Amino acid sequence: MNELDSLVATARAAFAEAKTPAELENAKAQFLGKSGRITELMKGMAALSVDEKKSRGAAINVAKQAIEAALTERRQQLADEELSLQLRAEALDVSLPGRRRIPGGLHPVSRTLERIEEIFSSMGFDVADGPEIESDWHSFTSLNNPPNHPARSMQDTFYVDLNGDDGIPYNLRPHTSPMQVRYAHQHIKKYAAEFAAAAADATGTVKAPEIRVIAPGRTYRVDSDATHSPMFHQCEGLWLGENVSFKDLKVVFTDFCRTFFESDDLVLRFRPSFFPFTEPSAEIDIQFASGPLAGRWLEVAGSGQVHPNVVRNMGLDPERYIGFAFGMGPDRLTMLRYGVNDLRLFFDGDLRFLSQFQ
């Protein structure tokens, strides 16, 4: 074996011993680098004759090509080994049982709110929205709640450490009624020309668009037990016009309940009550038709004819505009619809419970 063949064999052995790309590059420098063996051989031809240079140079190039081929081959081997290790590390054991993917769905209370909105929208009601942090005026004063009303106490209402323009702290709205007041103001502003024309018409034939709206949303009160939560949902409704009566309230709410509970035979009663924002006022009860509670009544809503002071605070003349309002708890309707006895179960976040309603 001549010198060049021995050099090629030595290079192949050095490349084979390299276990990483970095080691391979170090081995390459020994043979193909600027100070490598091949470079030294090329420099050694300086003293040779022209014919000897030609012959020697050709032989060295053959050896160089053989070393480069060995280097390329080893690089590919190392790359293949690295890929193989990576594939083994990322391999999937198809014999392992798969992880169950539980499909998500709407919360039962969200389903109830959607159903309420769909039913009232089909009756021509708009759906209002509004802030959950409210001023004292919107939460109480505008709704004919006097300053000494129990609802204003710290024991019943959550207050925020920030005062409004009136110097009274803001509150977490205890009901969604403020949304109705805000909606009424926006409605009157939107149809200002129509309301002005109706007010100027002495014949009474010009009518402004009626206010017909529901206000669903989260509300907050200092209360927590099996049937109450500090955060709960409420949906209030308002219908104001020039010829809206208590009869319309009975028709609308009866139709709603029968549609919601999918029972054309559902019996409702309107029981006299008191609310500062309606006069006259009534509690609305439904009767159980079957089961152990058959024949018994359950309160589902409060209602009444809107108090003149509230109509006035909405920006309308109570001598001309009249209407009704109602308020109900979607959480309680959800409990009734699904037969759940503890309201807190809906808000504990237990997927074992909530998945039953998907």
Swiss-Prot record:
EC number: 6.1.1.20
One Pfam family in the UniProt entry: tRNA-synt_2d
Cofactor: Mg(2+)
Domain of life: Bacteria
Cofactor note: Binds 2 magnesium ions per tetramer.
InterPro entries in the record: aa-tRNA-synth_II (IPR006195), aa-tRNA-synth_II/BPL/LPL (IPR045864), Phe-tRNA-synth_IIc_asu (IPR004529), Phe-tRNA_ligase_II_N (IPR004188), Phe_tRNA_ligase_alpha1_bac (IPR022911), Phenylalanyl-tRNA_Synthase (IPR002319), tRNA-bd_arm (IPR010978)
Location in or out of the cell: Cytoplasm
Chain sites annotated for binding Mg(2+): E279
Subunit field text: Tetramer of two alpha and two beta subunits.
Classification via PANTHER family: PHENYLALANINE--TRNA LIGASE, MITOCHONDRIAL, PHENYLALANYL-TRNA SYNTHETASE
Record-stated family: Belongs to the class-II aminoacyl-tRNA synthetase family. Phe-tRNA synthetase alpha subunit type 1 subfamily.
Name this protein carries in UniProt: Phenylalanine--tRNA ligase alpha subunit
Source organism of this protein record: Variovorax paradoxus (strain S110)
